[in-house]
């Protein structure tokens, strides 16, 4: 009889360990930091970025530490970063649900439309904690005029790192650092592209 209880306890412990190892911990990439916005140097244009509800609801799962995984919503979390990057360059920024409505774009005075594609990845060098210690976020934007003709493309990447001792309950720290760098680089790439002035 003790053998049966011992076997049952061992099986339960193995099942629990397997279940915990396979879970995905939620984190967020939203950053409070934005590039500086100097009204005297803003391009006097109204621009838009495209973000659909389906994109905002898209959940992604990537690697964390100790065999665990992390889950987050890249479009929802990075929407503020994209908007902040555009607001650092242009006078007026709006959001569209679709890029294809040329008449509405022209009527609204939109001169450029940014359609972003986001890719992310994470990893961890830690075997004792689950938060990612390395995070990469990349945004690639196709930029069109109000009628839908492609003007140019811009790309930006942000890499973030965080060590175990830095987390202090802030488990998405590496992701937020990546988002902050992505925002600054996207703003810089837009500003130096002559086709986007």
Residue ranges of model-derived segments:
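Sec-dependent bacterial lipoprotein signal peptides
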Residues: 1-23
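A structural "domain/chain start" motif
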Residues: 23-85, 189-197
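Surface-exposed short loop/turn segments
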Residues: 24-32, 98-151, 161-162
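Short secondary-structure boundary motifs at beta->alpha junctions and helix caps
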Residues: 65-74, 144-195
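Mid-chain, structured segments of secreted extracytoplasmic proteins
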Residues: 76-102
């Amino acid at each position: 009889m003790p053998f049966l209880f011992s076997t049952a306890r061992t099986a339960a412990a193995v099942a629990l360990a397997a279940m915990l190892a396979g879970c995905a911990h939620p984190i967020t990439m939203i950053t409070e930091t934005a590039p500086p916005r100097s009204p005297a140097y803003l391009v006097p244009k109204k621009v838009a970025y495209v973000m659909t509800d389906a994109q905002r609801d898209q959940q992604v799962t990537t690697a964390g530490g100790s065999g665990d995984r992390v889950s987050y919503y890249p479009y929802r979390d990075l929407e503020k970063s994209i908007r902040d990057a555009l607001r650092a360059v242009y006078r007026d920024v709006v959001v569209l649900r679709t890029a294809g409505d040329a008449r509405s774009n022209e009527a609204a005075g939109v001169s450029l439309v940014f359609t972003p594609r986001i890719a992310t990845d994470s990893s961890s060098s830690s075997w004792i904690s689950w938060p990612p210690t390395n995070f990469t976020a990349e945004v690639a934007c196709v930029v069109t005029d109000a009628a839908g003709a492609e003007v140019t493309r811009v790309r930006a990447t942000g890499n973030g790192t965080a060590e175990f001792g830095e987390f202090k309950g802030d488990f998405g720290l590496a992701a937020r650092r990546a988002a902050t760098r992505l925002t600054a680089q996207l703003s810089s790439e837009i500003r130096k592209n002559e086709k986007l002035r």
